[in-house]
Amino acid sequence: WKDLKKINAGSKFYERKDLNRKTSFVLLKEALSIFDKLCFNLDLKESGMAEKVYKIIKETNAEDRTLVSSFSPSRLDEFIELSNGEILTSGSFRENVIARYFPTKKRNLKIQALQAPFIYRGLKVHSRKLKDFCEINNLYLHIWTVNNNEDFDKCLEFGCDGIMTDEPLKLRTYLEQNS
């Protein structure tokens, strides 16, 4: 952790004139505490993180502004069992497959959202079937990774509940100009 704290985590985002500006990494607990008005979308990338992440969310009273997801069904299932529905979770690949092939069936799901890529390997993923599945099952729909105004337009026209982006300032400017 000491070594990570030395790295300038924001250097790629600064103008040349601001290269001496320093942005360090923060722990999840610090981020949830410092940015206590922001919503967080957390992805369990490694096994064994579910309990740690759950405890941090509880300690920082961030239950109502955090969504936890994972591409790994087992990691997600572990978190769902721990949180007992107290913290929003997004489906894994498994639920996205169900949505694609059985879009009109009501399911007994233990998740509250689905996340899907805008385009995957050149194919449009967000579809009417996916939107219908989310509506039938009372799920939020979040699309990732959307980085330009044209695609922001498409997501909003489509009725997405959330947009994940690598360009948060660009998205904020777009939303301010188009709301």
Tell what function each PLM region has:
Residues 70, 93-95, 143-149:
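Glycine-rich beta-to-alpha transition loops that act as phosphate-gripper elements at the mouths
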Residues 14-21, 25, 100-179:
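C-terminal active-site rim and adjoining tail of enzyme catalytic domains
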Residues 26-27, 76, 94-103:
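Alpha-helical scaffolding within the catalytic cores
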Residues 1-87, 109-137:
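Metal-dependent phosphodiesterase/phospholipase catalytic core, i.e.
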Residues 8, 72, 97-98, 167:
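Poly-acidic low-complexity segments
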Residues 87-90, 163-164:
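Paired acidic/hydrophobic, glycine-rich loop segments that form the ligand-binding mouth/hinge
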Residues 47-48, 96, 170:
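Solvent-exposed loop/turn segments at secondary-structure junctions
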